[in-house]
Amino acid sequence: MSNATKFGKVAVLLGGKSAERAVSLDSGQAVLDALLRSGVQAEAFDPQDRSVTELVNYDRAFIVLHGRGGEDGQIQGVLEWLNIPYTGTGVQGSAIGMDKVKTKQIWQGSDLPTAPYRIITKETDLDSVIAELGLPVIIKPVHEGSSVGMSKVEKAEDFAAAIEKATQHDAVVMAEKWITGREFTISFLNGQPLPVIRLQPPADVAFYDYEAKYQRNDVEYGIPCGLSETEEKKLQALCLRAFQAVGAEGWGRIDAMQDEQGNFWLLEVNTVPGMTSHSLVPKAAKAVGYSFDELCVAILEQTLEGTA
């Protein structure tokens, strides 16, 4: 690519110290390879092994750090301080997007549909949670991605074990009302929604969990998604509002459900989605003609805005 020199020297930020390190290494290597094939002068940069102050030696950064330290505003803040352009969402939007409770509060305040929830503490009366949300519920660490530490709870006696599992990953845990229905994901490129994908995990999987996302090959991805054209546009418009409400920018992903009555519910936002062979943003981009390499360059081009 003859104009790849416009990017200068690019740090592909990957790895890090979060629970999603392994996924980030896979995503980052895929992005690095794509940029190199496209003629970009790109290098891997793992903040676990190097001081972030070394980023001053780069012209821009492609963030492929998942989870804490990479998706929560921390690395974005460092890059802002160093005056280095970077891909994706800024400091505030990243911090909000990494916090499932803050995200839901903003969506609720924006009159956007998201499932009812309760924050769980040691003092929480679990019977009151069940009375309010019903069963089943899904237990989630508030500050983890990739479904790390999540469990579906169908019986009251399983509540404590699910909370214990979640607290191994985060001090803050939430219970969310289980939505029965079809799961969809909506990817964004240049701030605009791509075609909706329907997620169909195999029958033995309770939900689209870490294993289904990264380790299994029997998850079905529906493109087209099975919604009518009107419904798909409605879901895209809803998710665009949700994406913008939390301050997300550029590229990302929102997961949503359609319940048995046909209502849509927002689940969560992902401001640095996976870029592995199993990942959803590349699948959605492919549906509108982007190769993986073209997608990576398009995401990187966001860093040129305002610098030309």
From Swiss-Prot:
Catalytic activity, reaction form: 2 D-alanine + ATP = D-alanyl-D-alanine + ADP + phosphate + H(+)
GO cellular component annotations of the record? cytosol
Compartment(s) of residence: Cytoplasm
Its keywords, alphabetically, are: ATP-binding, Cell shape, Cell wall biogenesis/degradation, Cytoplasm, Ligase, Magnesium, Manganese, Metal-binding, Nucleotide-binding, Peptidoglycan synthesis
The cross-references to Gene3D superfamilies, in alphabetical order and at most eight, read: 3.40.50.20, ATP-grasp fold, B domain
What InterPro entries is this protein classified in?
ATP-grasp, D-Ala_lig_Van_CS, D_ala_D_ala, Dala_Dala_lig_C, Dala_Dala_lig_N, PreATP-grasp_dom_sf
Q: Does the keyword Magnesium apply?
A: yes
**Predominant localisation class:** cytoplasm
Q: What does the entry list as the binding residues for ATP?
A: 130-185
Pathway(s) it belongs to? Cell wall biogenesis; peptidoglycan biosynthesis
Q: Does the keyword RNA-binding apply?
A: no
Instruction: Say which enzyme class the record assigns.
Output: ligase
Disulfide cysteine pairs (residue numbers) = none
The record's Gene Ontology biological-process terms are: cell wall organization; peptidoglycan biosynthetic process; regulation of cell shape
Segments forming domain ATP-grasp: 104-301
Q: How is the cofactor bound?
A: Binds 2 magnesium or manganese ions per subunit.
Q: Which SUPFAM superfamilies match?
A: Glutathione synthetase ATP-binding domain-like, PreATP-grasp domain
| Binding-site list for Mg(2+) 2 | E268, N270
Look up the record and name the cofactor or cofactors this protein needs: Mg(2+); Mn(2+)
Single Gene Ontology MF annotation:
metal ion binding
Q: Where does Mg(2+) 1 bind?
A: D255, E268
E.C. number(s) listed in UniProt = 6.3.2.4
Describe its function.
Cell wall formation.
Q: Under which name does UniProt file this protein?
A: D-alanine--D-alanine ligase
